[in-house]
């Protein structure tokens, strides 16, 4: 018998061993994925639920200012927290522009390209622009000794907000404290908890201040430390205001004791601070305090308030063992083992150097005359 007849079985045997090794390697990779990723990392054996949350806040702090406009004045919570309550947020005023003793009447508009004039023909009666403080009367009157502007019917004198106080009016606001009370509920598991943990005593709660290292679960935060933890400078931010985010993460594994389900706090600045884009930076709004004089004339104090808005963002997911997701993931994992054969075939049919040997054994090619004989 010619020796060439013995070569093919030997080569096929070598191919079969390599195919078996590849097949086992693919199966081990799938097994590692199912056990390591699906069950251990992603906890595929658990049913999950999203958090339902409520938040209330309480700010404390007192400071004093002494200015030529207001004199010596005490500022407490009722003065600088506006409004007193918001949904999942709190605003603390840190800087302001006062326009005192405004009353409705006629006065010159602030000078700009659209309001400066030389005579009455430059002013249009009834004209109102986007940035107007009032309605033009059609008269051109002196704003000061060198400039004339169009007269308006408005709250007079009109506000001049071209110069923001620096440093911030309430510099001491960085020492104000905020108590954040957060109650959470996972309805699917009927599990509820709050961020004032059961281990806290009244004495501890009165004296603790949040610190990531020493007091990571204290729900009382110093405003300056919140800004600092987000990588910002409080005194700079206090001038024009900004929006901060206090994030509370409640990721809980309910297969463990309830004491392990605790909040994790993090901080970041939410409004974009870009040194290259200085148009309309920070956060501000206007409000007024109204008075009526004995003569019956209504007056007001207009305040343009700059400050830090703190948004409290609560998120989280809880998981607990359940038979249904466990069986679904086990079944999916077993089904993946069927992929091992397909992947193995792809490797040996298209990637290996001697792939034609495997193809010869996997597929049987029938000649035309053999096919005719079979059909006949």
Stretch-by-stretch model annotation:
Residues 1-79, 331, 338-363, 367-376:
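Membrane-anchoring signal-anchor transmembrane alpha-helices and their immediate flanking context
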Residues 9, 16, 20, 241, ...:
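Eukaryote-biased feature marking scaffold/signaling PDZ-domain proteins and nuclear chromatin regulators
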Residues 17, 255, 315:
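An acidic- and aromatic-residue-enriched active-site/binding cleft used to recognize and process polar
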Residues 21, 234-236, 294-297:
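Eukaryotic intrinsically disordered and solvent-exposed regulatory patches
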Residues 262-376:
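Membrane-proximal extracellular juxtamembrane segment immediately upstream
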């Amino acid at each position: 018998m010619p020796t060439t007849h013995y070569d093919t079985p030997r080569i096929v045997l070598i191919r079969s061993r390599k195919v078996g090794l590849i097949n086992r390697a693919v199966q081990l990779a799938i097994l590692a994925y199912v056990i390591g990723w699906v069950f251990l990392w992603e906890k595929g054996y658990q049913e999950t639920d999203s958090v339902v949350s409520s938040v209330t806040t309480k700010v404390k702090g007192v400071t004093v200012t002494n200015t030529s406009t207001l004199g010596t004045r005490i500022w407490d919570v009722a003065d600088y927290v506006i409004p007193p309550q918001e949904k999942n947020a709190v605003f603390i005023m840190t800087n302001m522009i006062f326009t005192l003793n405004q009353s409705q009447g006629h006065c010159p508009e602030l000078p700009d390209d659209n309001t400066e004039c030389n005579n009455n023909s430059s002013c249009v009666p009834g004209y109102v622009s986007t940035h107007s403080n009032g309605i033009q009367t059609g008269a051109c009157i002196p704003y000061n000794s060198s400039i004339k502007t169009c007269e308006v019917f408005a709250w007079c004198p009109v506000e001049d907000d071209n110069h923001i106080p620096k440093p911030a009016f309430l510099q001491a606001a960085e020492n104000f404290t905020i108590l954040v009370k957060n109650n959470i509920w996972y309805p699917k598991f009927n599990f509820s908890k709050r961020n004032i943990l059961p281990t806290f005593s009244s004495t501890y709660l009165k004296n603790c201040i949040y610190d990531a290292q020493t007091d990571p679960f204290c729900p009382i935060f110093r405003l300056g430390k919140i800004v600092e933890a987000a990588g910002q400078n409080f005194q700079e931010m206090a001038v024009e205001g900004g929006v901060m985010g206090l994030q509370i993460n409640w990721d809980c594994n309910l297969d463990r004791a309830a004491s392990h389900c605790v909040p994790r706090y993090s901080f970041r600045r939410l409004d974009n601070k870009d040194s290259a884009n200085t148009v309309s930076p920070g956060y501000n709004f206007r409000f007024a305090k109204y008075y009526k004089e004995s003569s019956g004339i209504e007056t007001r104090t207009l305040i343009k308030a700059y400050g830090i808005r703190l948004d409290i963002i609560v998120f989280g997911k809880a998981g607990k063992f359940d038979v249904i997701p466990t069986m679904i993931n086990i079944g999916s994992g077993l089904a993946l083992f069927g992929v091992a054969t397909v992947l193995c075939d792809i490797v040996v049919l298209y990637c290996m150097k001697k792939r034609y040997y495997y193809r010869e054994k996997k597929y049987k090619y029938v000649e035309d005359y053999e096919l005719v004989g079979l059909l006949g």
